């Protein structure tokens, strides 16, 4: 905001590289996303047509499918409202969420992704090859605004702090804090 002349700044959401609202004049600053969220595939299973997926069986496989389990859920702050409409990135491909986002996990369709295997990196927020998932996009899908989304990420998610492409610290609620 030009009128503020940068005398005092309440950085807030800008620390994440996100704009606080559409009312802010964006041409004065070039923000870059400073938040990424990654996980891994912990389980893979091929299911037959007619197999219900996740709690309540809300999604039923309409063909033979390969399903991956991602160990992130609403207990970690990943919105349950992304059930059946969100997606993640695996090997540069979109993998749609199937069924409900559970407390500690959710399932995605990886039938179309070649050579997918357990341990593969999963991008929930960020870039994977040419594909990108932004906080704003997820917020729109989940009917949340960006503040609500990033503030909702729980301390169960380990944090890694990076500067100039080098890890400078980590924070893991279950293991303590390490800053180099």
Model-based region annotation:
Residues 1-180:
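Active-site anion/phosphate-binding pocket segments in diverse small-molecule metabolic enzymes
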